[in-house]
């Protein structure tokens, strides 16, 4: 789970677009960049190198 206020201010580091939270995978999704950023121990990992590519 991610804090709603944090989700409101976080953006994709590549596109600067808002992110969507996927509770099933515990990731922040950037639709435009087609990347999923992991959340580990409650901390969003906003590094492109750590993101999973979406198909």
Swiss-Prot record:
GO terms for cellular component: cytosol. SUPFAM superfamilies: Trm112p-like. Gene3D superfamilies: 2.20.25.10. This is UPF0434 protein ERGA_CDS_01260. InterPro entries: Trm112-like (IPR005651). It comes from the Bacteria. Pfam families: Trm112p. Belongs to the UPF0434 family.
């Amino acid at each position: 789970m991610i804090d709603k206020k944090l989700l409101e201010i976080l953006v994709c580091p590549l596109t600067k677009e808002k992110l969507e939270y996927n509770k099933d995978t515990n990731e922040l999704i950037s639709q435009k960049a087609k990347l999923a950023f992991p959340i580990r121990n409650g901390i969003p990992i906003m590094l492109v190198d750590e993101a999973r590519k979406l198909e």
